[in-house]
């Protein structure tokens, strides 16, 4: 062990290593001095070089070997040239018979050649194994040089990759929005007008529709006869103000009717039946929704033909059709006009039977196959729908026909305007996030703040839900997340500071 003290001229009068013992390794120590023996002296290099005698014998032998190799190569080339000349003469005189004679002098020439001085260098110049065999006849040469014929049973296509039918799948995809737009273009105004005339002629005189706006909107109502998606098992008729809506189970299987003579005699088939039965159901539901409209500003309640109990479906009060005995879910025979009351006594709202409480007039909307849209149940949404312009109302009706509710479509249109594609994108993103379990109010906040980034929306919703469970206010959570760009730690510190200050 040793102790080391640094000089006072560097660190002053004291050092941090004073009286501190530490060990120094051998490799850091100064090497010991080695003394040369007495009389040892190194020779002078220049004197050694001057006294050295170098004869360059190896270099001279190498040059001689190179010259001998050149002579051997020239002798080989001369022998080959003479052999070719002799072979050409023999071929011109005797033809193929001279082949065996030519090979002997060639081998004799190669045998009489002197052996190479350096076999290693000589072997690098020529390789007898790879020397091609010489032939005499030109026909034989053409036969040898011609490519080999492929076998008849060989098919190169057997070794190629099989075409995957899914490779071209992307080329066959369609634009869903364009297809939906094309589907919603067709109209069935004349069909609805004929149906309305035939039914109102059989009804009472007080059930005649006098509202020209209702008739005009009825002619413009569009119907799609191709199912867009499988419904939820119910055919729901539209709810009109105080009129209670009727629900029909999809399990009911009734025989089809060739002519539509009475609203009670219509058959409501299964939802996966053919297009003609689906057309009958749609025409009936559309006519029923428009026949309950009054020319003034009121509607009457829907009266059942016999006693029936009100059931509740999806949160809305519905009144079943006891005349069709749909509660049992079994098949019921077709009811004719002689067995059932006329259309006017059941569903057409007359002026005398209208309740004292007036309701605003509703313009009939477009209905699709898979779902008949409900009128907005919220009075505020109902009044907002009436305040829209015709183009805005048409935009709302188009999106509602795709299966969305009025409230969601109106909220989306307030944020995105009348652009149907942007409304559909907004509703699709909103529905996906709600299906993942997020609060709809938080989803709307996320779509408003981070609509362009799905990753930031998910991060924002997760932090909002987490901070909301901690008990913080939504307003403060939104402010701090926007301020700190979804930074969890900084946002939590800010929220804690605000909570402590309050």
UniProtKB/Swiss-Prot annotation:
Interaction with ESCRT-I: region residues: 1-95
Organism in which the protein naturally occurs: Mus musculus (Mouse)
N-terminal signal peptide: none
Residue stretches of biased makeup (Basic and acidic residues): 80-100
Organs and tissues of expression: Ubiquitous. Highly expressed in heart, liver, brain, kidney, spleen, skeletal muscle, stomach, testis and lung.
PTM-bearing positions, type Phosphoserine: 146, 205, 289
An individual GO BP term: ubiquitin-dependent protein catabolic process via the multivesicular body sorting pathway
Chain positions covered by the region annotation Disordered: 80-117, 135-156
Region (Interaction with PTPN23): 260-290
Lineage, broadest ranks: Eukaryota, Metazoa, Chordata, Craniata, Vertebrata
The UBA domain, residue ranges: 389-430, 451-498
Oligomeric and partner information: Component of an ESCRT-I complex (endosomal sorting complex required for transport I) which consists of TSG101, VPS28, VPS37A and UBAP1 in a 1:1:1:1 stoichiometry. Interacts with PTPN23. Interacts (via UBA domains) with ubiquitinated proteins.
Acetylation recorded as keyword: no
Known role: Component of the ESCRT-I complex, a regulator of vesicular trafficking process. Binds to ubiquitinated cargo proteins and is required for the sorting of endocytic ubiquitinated cargos into multivesicular bodies (MVBs). Plays a role in the proteasomal degradation of ubiquitinated cell-surface proteins, such as EGFR and BST2.
Disruption phenotype: Lethality by postnatal day 14. Conditional deletion in neurons impairs endosomal ubiquitin processing and promotes neurodegeneration.
Keyword line: Cytoplasm, Endosome, Phosphoprotein, Protein transport, Repeat, Transport
Source organism, top-level taxon: Eukaryota
Name of the protein this chain belongs to: Ubiquitin-associated protein 1
Entry GO MF terms: ubiquitin binding
Location within or outside the cell: Cytoplasm, Cytosol; Endosome
Entry note about domains: The UMA domain mediates association with the ESCRT-I complex.
GO cellular component: cytosol; ESCRT I complex; plasma membrane
Domain (UMA): residue spans on this chain: 17-63
Matches recorded under InterPro entries: UBA (IPR015940), UBA-like_sf (IPR009060), UBAP-1-like_UBA2 (IPR049467), UBAP1 (IPR038870), UBAP1_C (IPR042575), UMA (IPR023340)
Keyword set includes Magnesium: no
């Amino acid at each position: 062990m040793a102790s080391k003290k640094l000089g006072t001229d560097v660190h002053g009068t004291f050092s941090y290593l004073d009286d501190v013992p530490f060990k120094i390794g051998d490799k850091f120590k100064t090497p010991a001095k080695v003394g040369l023996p007495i009389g040892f002296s190194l020779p002078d290099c220049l004197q050694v070089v001057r006294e050295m005698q170098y004869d360059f014998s190896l270099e001279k032998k190498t040059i001689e070997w190179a010259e001998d190799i050149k002579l051997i190569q020239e002798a080989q080339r001369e022998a080959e040239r003479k052999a070719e000349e002799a072979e050409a003469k023999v071929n011109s005189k005797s033809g193929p018979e001279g082949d065996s004679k030519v090979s002997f002098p060639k081998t004799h020439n190669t045998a009489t050649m002197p052996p190479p001085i350096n076999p290693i260098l000589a072997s690098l110049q020529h390789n007898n194994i790879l020397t091609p065999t010489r032939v005499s006849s030109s026909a034989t040469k053409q036969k040898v040089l011609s490519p080999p014929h492929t076998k008849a049973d060989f098919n190169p296509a057997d070794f190629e990759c099989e075409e995957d039918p899914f490779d071209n799948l992307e080329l066959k995809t369609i634009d869903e929005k364009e297809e939906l737009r094309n589907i919603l273009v067709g109209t069935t105004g004349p069909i609805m007008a004929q149906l309305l005339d035939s039914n109102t002629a059989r009804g009472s005189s007080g059930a005649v529709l006098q509202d020209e706006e209702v008739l005009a909107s009825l002619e413009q109502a569009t119907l799609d006869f191709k199912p867009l998606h499988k419904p939820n098992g119910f055919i729901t008729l539209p709810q009109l103000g105080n009129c209670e809506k009727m629900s029909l189970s999809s399990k009911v299987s009734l025989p089809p009717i060739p002519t539509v003579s009475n609203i009670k005699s219509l058959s409501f088939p299964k939802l996966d039946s053919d297009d003609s039965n689906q057309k009958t159901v749609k025409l009936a539901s559309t006519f029923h929704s428009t026949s309950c409209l009054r020319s003034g500003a009121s509607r009457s309640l829907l009266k059942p033909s016999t006693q029936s109990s009100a059931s509740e479906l999806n949160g809305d009060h519905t009144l079943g059709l006891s005349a069709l005995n749909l509660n049992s879910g079994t098949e019921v025979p077709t009811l004719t006009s002689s067995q059932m009351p006329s259309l006017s006594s059941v569903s057409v709202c007359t002026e005398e039977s209208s309740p004292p409480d007036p309701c605003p007039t509703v313009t009939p909307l477009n209905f699709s196959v898979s779902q008949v849209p409900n009128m907005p149940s919220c009075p505020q949404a109902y009044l907002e729908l009436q305040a829209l312009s015709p183009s805005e109302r048409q935009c709302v009706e188009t999106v509602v026909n795709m299966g969305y509710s009025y409230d969601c479509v109106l909220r989306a249109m307030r944020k995105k305007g009348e652009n149907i594609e942007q409304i559909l994108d907004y509703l699709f993103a909103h529905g996906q996030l709600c299906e993942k379990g997020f609060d709809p109010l938080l989803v709307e906040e996320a779509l408003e703040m981070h609509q362009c980034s799905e990753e930031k929306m998910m991060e924002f919703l997760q932090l909002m839900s987490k901070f909301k469970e901690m008990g913080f206010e939504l307003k403060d959570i939104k402010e701090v997340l926007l301020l700190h760009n979804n930074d969890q730690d900084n946002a939590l510190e800010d929220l804690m500071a605000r909570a402590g200050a309050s």
